[in-house]
Curated annotation (Swiss-Prot):
Keywords from the UniProt entry: Cytoplasm, Phosphoprotein
Protein name: FHA domain-containing protein FhaA
Record note on what altering residue 459 to A does: Abolishes phosphorylation by PknB. Strong decrease in affinity for MviN
Mutagenesis or variant effect for residue 461 to A: Does not affect affinity for MviN
Consequence recorded when altering residue 473 to A: Abolishes phosphorylation by PknB
Subunit structure: Interacts with (phosphorylated) MviN and (phosphorylated) PknB via the FHA domain. Binds to the PknB juxtamembrane domain with an affinity that is modulated by the degree and the pattern of phosphorylation of this juxtamembrane domain.
Organism this protein belongs to: Mycobacterium tuberculosis (strain ATCC 25618 / H37Rv)
Annotated Gly residues bias: 300-322
Localization (cell): Cytoplasm
CDD domains: FHA_FhaA-like
Amino acid sequence: MGSQKRLVQRVERKLEQTVGDAFARIFGGSIVPQEVEALLRREAADGIQSLQGNRLLAPNEYIITLGVHDFEKLGADPELKSTGFARDLADYIQEQGWQTYGDVVVRFEQSSNLHTGQFRARGTVNPDVETHPPVIDCARPQSNHAFGAEPGVAPMSDNSSYRGGQGQGRPDEYYDDRYARPQEDPRGGPDPQGGSDPRGGYPPETGGYPPQPGYPRPRHPDQGDYPEQIGYPDQGGYPEQRGYPEQRGYPDQRGYQDQGRGYPDQGQGGYPPPYEQRPPVSPGPAAGYGAPGYDQGYRQSGGYGPSPGGGQPGYGGYGEYGRGPARHEEGSYVPSGPPGPPEQRPAYPDQGGYDQGYQQGATTYGRQDYGGGADYTRYTESPRVPGYAPQGGGYAEPAGRDYDYGQSGAPDYGQPAPGGYSGYGQGGYGSAGTSVTLQLDDGSGRTYQLREGSNIIGRGQDAQFRLPDTGVSRRHLEIRWDGQVALLADLNSTNGTTVNNAPVQEWQLADGDVIRLGHSEIIVRMH
């Protein structure tokens, strides 16, 4: 009988809609508020769902679809207010003894398929609905995934008139399959700024900020998309700042050893030519960051001090992989003396960089008496000519050093690395953190990924993972996650919490644990 009754109601409603559309097409006319109220009440009655305990659940979100002309007149008609319709419909639902999960919300949207005087209404059960007070900010068409299962579900609104529990009803019964409606976005259309660039790239122009080296030229709001900038090279960007490469500041000071020249011998001053420009390298002191450009500046014996002939530059371990520290007995070790020509070496492996001044023995900081008088080599295992460290030390010395933290070979923090910084954060301490996902085992597919700190699970508005289950307290349990350990704690809930069918107050979660609260089950997944 119930199915026959619904069929008859459906046929009657279809006939009413057909007749009403025909009159609207022929005679036109405006929308009458009483007709809208009647349609909303009929939609609420048609959307009733039966729950356990002889309770009836009505939709709480209603979308009224109007033609374009009627939609534009909404702001001028004070009787066509979504808040007024929602208030009247909520009173009607309460009078009928029905329940809703969430506040009753009425929204308007437009459709180009409807003529003047035609309108449609549809109702859905949406626990995540939020009230939008402005009428003109009408609801945009619902997307197919608006209420789908997403990690970190936003707080749901709560209906204060909802009394009593829903029993064993599955939470996914609240989700209506009518969310997937045709999308008719009133704000759709081409991008108003999608036109061509009126400037046509970057012709010379006056006014505004002048084209500054190092910063993009000023753009008009209607200029168009970013690709028209033609990238940084054509802007003159950082390269034309005459940036860091040929600063010749620290290198041409000859570290701190040639302090007689000091800063006045910084060469061109300011920010020298770009990395791409490679001015000739003087055969004198090493250019460090400068003369040969970006790559050679790091692979020549630059840095804070010049590399004596044959000396090992930069992070010594990078330069000659596997070679032990140079000793002053060796012929290639020159403790002091005039700097030789820059030594051309391949890119990064022999980078001179910052370490040069700390590895050249007496050649660095020497003439300023920073290292000439004191024996800083006592921090390594071999006495050397005074200086900060024996040549070839540095971070990347791969074998047998007393500062490689007990490893006999190249540093290995999870994968082979040529030394020093390149192995950091890979393996060892774990390059990727563990994540914990809670999966609601009710067929809805809802999941929630734990955030670091407190994660509240319950039925209330302040819960990060809300469950539409009246057997669940508003603040039922808390899971604290610190990136390594997930600790569950029951928050004095009414019906309690079980993990793997065992009642718990506190519990350290593991992969595969099954949390039961109210009539809901949550499976813990650790990745």
